[in-house]
From Swiss-Prot:
The keyword Ion transport does not apply. This is Myosin light chain kinase family member 4. It catalyses: L-seryl-[protein] + ATP = O-phospho-L-seryl-[protein] + ADP + H(+); L-threonyl-[protein] + ATP = O-phospho-L-threonyl-[protein] + ADP + H(+). ATP binds at L112, G113, G114, G115, R116, F117, G118, Q119, V120, K135. Its EC number is 2.7.11.1.
Length: 388
């Protein structure tokens, strides 16, 4: 595989924003070229898939060389503490007609993020002083408004500590404002690319457990996220390992009898069925979970190419491996976990419930061993510092 850009350079290259890097594949010709290429070169496709065997587990609705983003990492002791719930009870929200400023003070200077939709500002409820986040979404017509109202409907159905919660909503002529739970830890993506942030396999386990718990809840509610990526996962604060999944703008209600197809998403996280414009379902999110696990463990993006076409090519060929030196000290359980998710045939991928039962996320003996190794590495690093 060709050497690819650093992930932070990739973001700039695609001229997109951290909270909403959408790539809408309206030009289907590029995908068709990739598919034609693969049909001619599919002889050894299965040997590249990163797994030798897999079984179908989706009957239950419960449900080339890559450039490293950073060097090898170690960190302080990780503590498995659940993410705190929102500072308010779950509520059913409908968009009110009127101005958000009548009830909230929206900061013009504290901008938390932004993208195709508009911007997210820090805000405060006037009556209570509750700190919140206001996502201001520009709406140019009825279609835009219906998309935002779908996001509201989705969030109304989701009540879980690892999913950001909706507090209020306001509709005016040119925009809809979603007032949401506020967290200040930044994006998980920032921790991947931050050279000063130390991340271990045990830290990754803590993140992945929470991601899978949030996705399991979504799937139990028959909702697909369809845009899972580190930019759409926020850390509760700067130091802890608790996370919350955000951005349900592309989420869809899954109805088994109604075959759903989508043609949106961020290229490097797309499942093969999205690239092929085939039917999507719960396993589509789990592919993205596999990509996130791969990135957290190694600092590498498994399918990222120099351009969209090359990235889609890699995805359709299911061309990935665990041979990079960044995986040298990673446990076999972690490698097996990834291999059960990055599978081209979606029915063979493990579900969120199965992922949480996998030894990598559930074996306390493994976690104790990784913790002991982390302490040993910390002591070794400290000794090296003293020697120098």
């Amino acid at each position: 595989m060709l050497k690819v850009k650093r992930l932070e350079e990739f973001n700039t290259c695609y001229n997109s924003n951290q909270l909403e890097k959408m790539a809408f594949f309206q030009c289907r010709e590029e995908v068709e070229k990739v598919k034609c290429f693969l049909e001619k070169n599919s002889g050894d496709q299965d040997s590249r898939s990163g797994h030798n065997e897999a079984k179908e587990v989706w009957s239950n609705a419960d449900l080339t060389e890559r450039m490293p983003v950073k060097s090898k990492r170690t960190s302080a002791l990780a503590v498995d503490i659940p993410a705190p719930p929102a500072p308010f009870d779950h509520r059913i929200v409908t968009a009110k007609q009127g101005a958000v400023n009548s009830f909230y003070t929206v900061s013009k200077t504290e901008i938390l993020g932004g993208g195709r939709f508009g911007q997210v500002h820090k805000c405060e409820e006037t009556a209570t002083g509750l700190k919140l986040a206001a996502k201001i979404i520009k709406t140019r017509g009825m279609k835009d408004k219906e998309e935002v109202k779908n996001e509201i409907s989705v969030m109304n159905q989701l009540d879980h500590a690892n999913l950001i919660q909706l507090y209020d909503a306001f509709e005016s002529k040119n925009d809809i404002v979603l007032v949401m739970e506020y967290v200040d830890g930044g994006e998980l993506f920032d921790r991947i690319i931050d050279e000063s942030y130390n991340l271990t396999e045990l830290d990754t386990i803590l993140f992945m457990k929470q991601i899978c718990e949030g996705i399991r809840h979504m799937h139990q509610m028959y909702i697909l996220h369809l845009d899972l990526k580190p930019e759409n996962i926020l850390c509760v604060n700067r130091d802890a390992k608790q996370i919350k999944i955000i951005d349900f703008g592309l989420a869809r209600r899954y109805k088994p009898r109604e075959k759903l197809k989508v043609n949106f998403g961020t290229p490097e996280f797309l499942a093969p069925e999205v690239v092929n414009y085939d039917f999507v379902s719960f396993p589509t999110d789990m592919w993205s979970v596999g990509v996130i696990a791969y990135m957290l463990l190694s600092g590498l993006s498994p399918f990222l190419g120099d351009n969209d076409a090359e990235t889609l090519n890699n995805i359709l060929a299911c061309r990935w491996d665990l041979e990079d030196e960044e995986f040298q000290d990673i446990s076999e359980e972690a490698k097996e976990f990834i291999s059960k998710l990055l599978i081209k045939e979606k029915s063979w991928r493990i579900s969120a419930s199965e992922a949480l039962k996998h030894p990598w996320l559930s074996d306390h003996k493994l976690h104790s061993r990784l913790n002991a190794q982390k302490k040993k590495n910390r002591g070794s690093d400290a000794q090296d510092f003293v020697t120098k």
